[in-house]
Amino acid sequence: EQVMHIFCQDKKLNISPAYLKPGFAFGGSCLPKDLRALSYQAKLHDLQLPILTSILPSNELQIARGLQMIVEKGNRKVGILGFSFKAGTDDLRESPVIEVIERLIGKGYDLVIYDKNVNIARLVGANRDFILNRIPHISKLMVNSTDAVLEHADTVVIGNNDPEFREVAKRVRDDQQIVDFVRVLDGRSSGVNQDGLLHKTAAARGER
């Protein structure tokens, strides 16, 4: 964390710390599609673009690592906080959290999901058809409050960095665990172990 803080002090080339800080897998309607298009065009012209062609496989490893961290907790009841591809949007296209959810469903996990932006989109948004037609099985797992997630889950997964989830994490019970994909919680002040993606238990709240 201290090393990353130093890197992010550059204000000339680094227009935003978000470009340098490590995070979870990316998604959305643009970047994955653009990478596939560039890689395809490179193959057509017999060009080697090792950096570009390694990005999507690397992204897949991040998704697999996130799933592994949940599985390692050993709890079958899981609550997901945020599953749009980033905070503040209802866009679910190529969301990496959806891929994690699909794999958990395949493994028989008992899931509930909360995302306030997607809850609204399910009723009136442009993504309504996507939610109802492409992922109806996931839509059925959605709940309307963070309280419902905390009541259900033994493992709570923070899927995007909505500021709301920082406050929710403070209400996690001692017998619950948190897997934080996006560093919503501040590991520097918690003294918690960090292993790849940031994961936290009750110690993250300063408890002993």
For every predicted segment, state its role.
Residues E1-R208:
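Structural/interface elements that position substrates and couple domains in central-metabolism enzymes
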